């Protein structure tokens, strides 16, 4: 439960139809299993206490009379168990029979939720035996049950006293399939998780639709959704059920027991902090008052994580998705640049080409933009500006890349200019400090700006999102331009986009792109080593970009605090980095992220391509003089 992770489960109850005592033992077995697994919240199938397929036996006093004693047995047995459990059962109230979910925890019957939408078409005829909760007119009732006074109604919001974000509501099977499901009101009223007790039969194509429906509902409502369907041990007289379990969070299926698979429990963790952050930032997510809170006490525990946490959250896990993502990003970037060039009536674009990844991607975008505009690639002006740290490999790759793409390329060696500048300001060339480095970066920007003035062009900056987050750019140097095509593409994704382009390129261009991909990331502002190789490697100085991109994604997208970032990174990387290494770079990230906001407050225009970006005019509006002491203190305390 700490850090917002609620361990949820959908449980199998292999019923014997109408054998309430046998089914009770099965329910208790699942509850004990969930307790041993550290589950917070357990969902069992619809009408699992009796079996869903009892048919007209639901008119029998003998069957219905066995329900309350069995429920009392379950409530009593729950006294020593940790999970909150939702059990499906038939229940009489006010002279009518309702298809219900009873929510049980630690010897308490917290509440009973009746089903609202009863299917009465095709193979289903629930209205023959049951009444809809619509007859209750949305009112909340209290009923005597198992020696307790129990809330009864569809507007119950179950709230954990020890964690504000840990709230859930309940709907049953068909409730999910209608245009306005109860879950809409429940989530608008504050429920972070929806439990669905279901008995959905298996027919061709239905599992795919069900999976899509659960995922889409969790996305639309920004909620966690636990779906638990009935077992094949239900009557097969006219239907077959499949034991289909689904656990989804905000559009992503976290865990699934596929139809007819044999899992007794399907378990994952729903991050309620993440969900509430999503609702907080989405101001169109309206709230609805009028739900009845039902408070329960569940001690906070450290949840053992089992869900997948992607170590590279910006990068899709599958090749097909990655190719689609890369193509979509390139289209957004190139369309954005095309519009800017046309609007300004620019005759050319000018960019510094270094033989590194970022300038390579920027050039590829420029080529696409000029293709879209029907203009010659020769109107793209690339400039290589060698100085003290430039290596033969990067310079050669820069020139080859330009030649392969058919763009204009020229060299302006800035060594003499920088040395003159050192002399002008009285800086010793042997002192390789920040002045030594930044003089080169600013000289390069000046050259590009002046060439753009000469040719009525736009300077295209090559820096990307990860560098902006860390402030790894020279203020008014490579930080500045007239348009920033890479500004919302993180470093980990830049690599894959270039790789994607290499895969569809002619052999000679592919060879250059692959060598660029194989080159260490470096600004090349310090002299090369004795072998002429890159001596200044960015990731040795600021840390692994995959770690920083991980921190950046979860900080900006979900508001995660340092403690949670550290915990998730340890889990996601599975021992690739030691705890000490992760913590070291987390501290660096927190410090630099706050210190370097002043650079982000005045960055050039550029296209947003993903949900995480740092534009001061769009997604990230942070004061340049905000203090990061809270974040740093928490990181230091880990």
Regions found by a protein language model. Give the residues of each.
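ATP/NTP-dependent adenylation/nucleotidyl-transfer catalytic domains that generate, transfer
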Residues: 6, 23, 164-166, 223, ...
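Enzyme catalytic cores with a strong preference for nitrogen-chemistry domains
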Residues: 1-352, 368-377, 409
């Amino acid at each position: 439960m700490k850090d917002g992770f609620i361990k949820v489960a959908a449980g199998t109850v292999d019923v014997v139809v109408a054998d309430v005592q046998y089914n009770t033992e099965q329910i208790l077995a699942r509850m004990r299993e969930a307790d041993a697994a550290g589950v917070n919240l357990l969902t069992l199938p619809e009408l699992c206490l009796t079996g869903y397929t009892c048919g007209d036996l639901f008119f029998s006093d003998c069957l219905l009379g066995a329900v309350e004693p069995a429920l009392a047995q379950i409530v009593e047995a729950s006294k020593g168990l940790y999970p909150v459990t939702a059990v499906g059962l038939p229940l009489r109230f006010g002279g009518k029979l309702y298809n219900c979910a009873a929510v049980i925890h630690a010897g308490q019957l917290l509440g009973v939720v009746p089903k609202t939408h009863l299917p009465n078409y095709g193979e289903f005829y629930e209205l023959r035996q049951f009444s809809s909760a619509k007859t209750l007119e949305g009112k909340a009732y209290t009923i005597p049950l198992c020696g307790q006074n129990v809330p009864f109604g569809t507007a119950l919001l179950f709230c954990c006293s020890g964690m504000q974000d840990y709230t859930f509501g309940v709907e049953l099977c068909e409730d999910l399939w209608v245009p306005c499901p109860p879950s809409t009101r429940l989530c608008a009223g504050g429920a972070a998780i929806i439990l669905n007790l279901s008995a959905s039969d298996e027919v061709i194509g239905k599992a795919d639709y069900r999976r899509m429906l659960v995922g889409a509902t969790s996305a639309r409502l920004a909620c966690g959704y636990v779906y638990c369907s009935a077992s094949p041990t239900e009557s097969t007289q006219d239907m077959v059920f499949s034991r289909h379990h689904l656990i989804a969070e905000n559009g992503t299926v976290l865990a699934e027991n596929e139809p007819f698979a044999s899992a007794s429990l399907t378990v994952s963790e729903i991050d309620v902090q993440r969900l509430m952050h999503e609702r907080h930032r989405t101001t169109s997510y309206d709230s609805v008052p009028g739900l009845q809170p039902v408070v329960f006490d569940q001690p906070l525990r450290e949840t053992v994580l089992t869900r997948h946490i992607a170590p590279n959250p910006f990068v899709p896990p599958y090749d097909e998705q990655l190719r689609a993502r890369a193509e979509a990003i390139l289209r957004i970037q190139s369309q954005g640049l095309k519009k800017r060039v046309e609007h300004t009536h620019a005759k050319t674009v000018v960019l510094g080409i270094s033989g590194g990844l970022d300038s390579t991607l920027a050039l590829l975008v420029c080529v696409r933009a000029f293709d879209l505009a029907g203009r010659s690639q020769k109107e793209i002006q690339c400039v290589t500006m060698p100085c003290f740290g430039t290596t033969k490999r990067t310079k050669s790759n820069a020139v080859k890349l330009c030649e392969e793409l058919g763009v204009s390329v020229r060299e302006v060696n800035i060594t003499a200019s920088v040395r003159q500048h050192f002399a002008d300001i009285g800086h010793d060339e042997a002192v390789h400090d920040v002045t030594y480095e930044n003089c080169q970066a600013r000289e390069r920007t000046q050259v590009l700006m002046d060439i753009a003035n000469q040719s009525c062009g736009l300077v295209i900056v090559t820096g990307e999102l990860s560098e902006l987050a860390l402030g790894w750019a020279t203020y008014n140097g490579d930080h500045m331009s007239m348009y920033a095509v890479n500004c919302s593409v993180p470093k980990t994704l830049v690599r894959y986009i270039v790789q994607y382009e290499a895969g569809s390129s002619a052999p000679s261009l592919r060879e250059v792109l692959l060598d660029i991909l194989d080159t260490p990331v470096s600004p090349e502002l310090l002299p090369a080593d004795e072998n002429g190789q890159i001596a200044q490697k960015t990731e040795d100085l600021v840390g692994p970009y995959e770690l920083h991109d991980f921190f950046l994604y979860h900080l900006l997208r979900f508001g995660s605090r340092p403690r949670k970032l550290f915990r998730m990174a340890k889990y996601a990387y599975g021992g690739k980095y030691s705890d000490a290494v992760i913590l070291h770079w987390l501290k660096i990230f927190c410090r630099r992220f706050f210190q370097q906001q002043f650079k982000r407050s005045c960055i050039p225009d550029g296209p947003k391509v993903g949900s995480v970006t740092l534009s001061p005019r769009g997604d990230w509006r942070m004061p340049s003089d905000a203090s990061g002491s809270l974040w740093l203190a928490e990181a230091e305390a880990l």
